[in-house]
From Swiss-Prot:
This is COP9 signalosome complex subunit 5. InterPro entries: JAMM/MPN+_dom, JAMM_MPN+_peptidase_M67A, MPN. Residues 74-216 form the MPN domain. The keyword Cytoplasm applies. Gene3D superfamilies: Cytidine Deaminase, domain 2. Belongs to the peptidase M67A family. CSN5 subfamily. The gene is RRI1. Its main location: cytoplasm. Keywords: Cytoplasm, Hydrolase, Metal-binding, Metalloprotease, Nucleus, Protease, Signalosome, Zinc.
Length: 465
């Protein structure tokens, strides 16, 4: 410590973020909110870390011969901690391995970054073979030395890390042999162990730093170093990560619910339209067998009125048939004339629903009495409710609104060819509108689902194996 009179290790630790790694929780949202508030603190930390890097030409005192437990502290950057945890999580139940980059000052390891190492691992063991060491040397020469030399920084390989999936952080016998061998040839050297499964279950990073030593019986043992996480300039790579991939699950669910409701309403309207069309086709077939020519578009509109009125009448009053004859009004009946309940006079035709032309002097009193009776019954009968305007601004219901609604009680749809053509066009427009609404809302729902899938896939690839 005599070579570093201007720098005290205890002061170095007190100026950095002082909290134990076992209590460190990964909270991206909290980190985003505190970026602006911690800007000044990060600048102070950066200047302090630059002071550490400026000691690159000085070698740490080799006090391990006098004190095997000389190294006691580890300063781990948030970037290196996140990369170690992500690599271990991707490995799942298989152990993974990587190298640590940083410097040593006094009895403290300062780790700035790390990189993965391609090795063959099992559930309980991981070893680096010759190919792995060749990759490590080439990666360090091509990526680490050139990158950090441009920034006037010098990062060395000062240790290794590996995972213990599910069985806590410690050094096994093989781990102790590997660490002891590295300490003999390239000390100072550090070993970090992380447990991804317990980190995920406890929502806390379970990580530990270890070194080995020889006890009095010349047996190899290990001890744990105090580990502290600090912030550095290298964490700028983390900040955009939490901003570029937000997951607005609540907003997506609200949009999905709204469009799903609209899609359901469109399908219901389409179903009602098909039911009315089927009823009209059935009625048209029956009328064709009785030699009655009826236009389909007008009957669809009429059937819509009758279908809705039958559902809402509840038995109060009788329904007046629009398709009635000019001779006798039929009330409460589906036929034009009730032949069994009426005694036909000599002036009425049994085979036809149209009155025969008779001598006015002989039939005037009879017809006057019948017309008065029919008019009184029509005035007392309930009026037909207007059903189609339930679809506001619909394309075929508007023809019966206001002044466009036919007021003539004897209005016959069969004779209104121009009206039928207009109704047919309105029905086609309504059919096309329902189809377009269905396709549009379906496409929007699919896009929302795909967007949600892409976000979940990205999160799965980043934080799971």
């Amino acid at each position: 410590m005599d070579d570093f009179p201007s720098l005290n290790v205890s002061d170095l630790e007190s100026k950095l973020l002082d909290y134990n790694i076992r209590d460190y929780e990964v909270q991206n949202s909290k980190h985003k909110n505190n970026i602006a508030g911690n800007e000044k603190e990060s600048i102070d930390q950066l200047s302090l870390l630059n002071q550490v890097c400026s000691l690159k030409n000085r070698k740490a005192i080799d006090s391990t011969k006098n004190s095997p437990l000389f190294y006691q502290n580890v300063l781990l950057s948030k970037l290196a901690c996140s990369k170690i945890l992500c690599h271990a999580t991707k490995g799942g139940n298989i152990e993974v391995m990587g190298m640590l980059l940083g410097n040593v000052i006094g009895n403290t390891f300062v780790i700035f970054d790390c990189f993965e190492l391609p090795v063959e691992g099992t559930e309980t063991m991981v070893n680096a073979h010759m190919e792995s060491y060749e990759y490590m040397v080439q990666f360090y020469h091509e990526m680490v030395e050139r990158s950090y030399t441009r920034n006037e920084e010098n990062l060395n390989i000062i240790g290794w890390y590996h995972s213990h999936p599910g069985y806590d952080c410690w050094l096994s016998n093989i781990d102790m042999q590997t660490q002891s061998l590295n300490q003999q040839h390239q000390d100072p050297y550090l070993a970090i162990v992380v447990d991804p499964h317990k980190s995920k279950n406890d929502q806390k990073v379970r990580i530990g730093s270890f070194r080995t030593y020889q006890d009095q019986n010349d047996d190899t043992n290990f001890y744990e170093l105090n580990t502290t996480v600090f912030d550095s300039e290298l964490n700028k790579l983390e900040n955009p990560l939490s901003v570029k991939i937000p997951f607005n699950s609540i907003e997506s669910r609200n949009l999905e619910s709204n469009y799903l409701q609209k899609l359901s309403e469109t399908v219901k309207q389409w179903r009602n339209f098909k039911i009315m069309e089927k009823i009209e086709n059935t009625a048209h077939t029956e009328d064709t067998t009785t030699n009655k020519s009826i236009s389909t578009p007008g009957r669809i509109i009429q059937t819509a009125h009758e279908f809705a009125f039958a559902a809402t009448s509840n038995g109060n009053g009788s329904r007046v048939n629009i398709m009635r004859s000019n001779s006798v009004s039929s009330i409460g009946s589906s036929s034009d004339i009730e032949m069994e309940d009426r005694n036909c006079s000599a002036f009425d035709s049994v085979a036809s629903s149209i009155n025969t032309i008779a001598d006015p002097s002989r039939t005037s009193s009879i017809h006057t009495q019948m017309n008065n009776q029919n008019n009184q019954q029509e005035r007392n009968s309930p009026k037909r409710p207007h059903i189609l305007p339930a679809i506001q601004s619909s394309r075929y219901g508007v023809i019966f609104e206001g002044k466009d609604r036919p007021e003539n009680k004897n209005f016959n749809i069969r004779t209104a060819s121009a009206q039928d053509a207009f109704e047919s066009k309105c029905i086609d427009d309504f059919h096309e509108s329902l189809k377009n609404d269905y396709l549009t809302q379906k496409e929007i729902l699919l896009r929302l689902k795909l967007r949600q899938y892409y976000r979940l896939r990205m999160y799965r690839d980043m934080f799971s194996k």
